[in-house]
Amino acid sequence: MSTIAETILDFDGPTPRVVADLRNINFEIEHVRDDLEEVYSDKDLEQAYQLIMSNQVTGDDFKKLVGRSRYNAQTLFFEDIVVFLFSSDRYEAVFASFDYDGDFPVNELVARVSETDGDE
């Protein structure tokens, strides 16, 4: 398990829905919350992985365009779910999703992961 995934799972806040280490040719689901274990099929997870990794490739191009070498996190906010994508290396990342409401500690989680990522 990556250090970033460990940091997310150890974060003092809401329990993640899903945490996965995404590598350039495969992925490893590190955590699925108990109530969601039967919700996602292997096909769903593989499709999500392919979509996220294609986004990683375009994200690298976008970073060059804006003159930055890295970003701390990408976030997607849905009505009741927030998704984080923490880049860990070129074409590698950690995916984490949580139940979302206005009280979710978004900045605190990003800061904690950024601190940990800087220690590696």
Per-region residue spans from a language model:
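Non-catalytic interaction/Regulatory regions outside core domains
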Residues: 1-120
